[in-house]
Amino acid sequence: MANEINHEFWRAFRHAVRAVKEDIFLIGEIWEEAGIWLQGDQFDSTMNYDFRKHCRRFFGEQTADAGEFDSRMTDMRMRYRKQTVYAQLNLLDSHDVSRFRSLCRDEESFRLAVIFQMTFPGMPSVFYGDEVGLTGILEEEYRQPMPWDTLDESSPLFLLYQKAITLRKKEAVLRRGEYRTLLAEPGSRVYGYERYLEKEDGSIESIRIFLNMEEENVPLPEELLGGEILWQEGLKEGQLAAKGFALIRARD
């Protein structure tokens, strides 16, 4: 835990390691608000446990609606400078917390959390075993070894991770684009947002993402659906199925 050592040490540590390797990237394990460690003289990034906490309430425990989830995510983004937000290590799991899959009621909810993680500003962190749905509440459970002998690279969850990572690598807008909320009504569990990026020619590239955490099909606003469907599960005739998602490249 980086906060258990004083700031003077980390400033000296940064100076020492940068003298050896100028482009080294330092990530600190900080569980609380990390602004004081991210002033450019200590760490370049921190493990974003707030990201996990808010995702846990929306996708896992389902105690937050879309409005609250968006409000907390907005507060988290506004807390730091833009370059810091885009460098934060966004995690669902780590070596110190119960497996996120165990906190979700079903695999479908976990899948939506993964889609959100891979399309949110920052650096998505995949802890070993996330891609195969490892579970565990207690320390001896969530730190269990990787089940190499039973690893199924054709499982739906493994393929979801592969496709989400491939899409993020391919689409610069998902890595560098701005973030804008589209749907986040209080009392609703349907969340929609947009990643958009101005290109060199002045045009705007945009990908809209919709996640339905409701237990029933919901209609999406027609004006938000125009464009090329990049990836979808459960989108049909303007209706998004329960626990479905859609990624749409918006028309210019």
Give the label of every model feature segment.
Residues 127-128, 135-138, 142-207:
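Glycan-recognition and catalytic regions of carbohydrate-active enzymes
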Residues 1-83, 116, 135-163, 216:
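Active-site-proximal helices and loops of the catalytic beta/alpha 8
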Residues 213-225:
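Surface-exposed beta-strand/loop patches in extracellular or lumenal glycoproteins
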Residues 16, 23-25, 87-89, 123-126, ...:
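Beta-sheet entry/capping signal
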Residues 223-234:
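Solvent-exposed beta-hairpin/edge-strand motifs
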Residues 236-252:
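C-terminal beta-strand-rich structural cap/linker in extracellular carbohydrate-active enzymes
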Residues 40-45, 86-93, 98-108, 114-153:
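Aromatic/acidic polysaccharide-binding cleft in carbohydrate-active enzymes
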Residues 29, 129-131, 212, 243:
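Active-site beta-strand/loop signature of hydrolases that rely on acidic residues for catalysis
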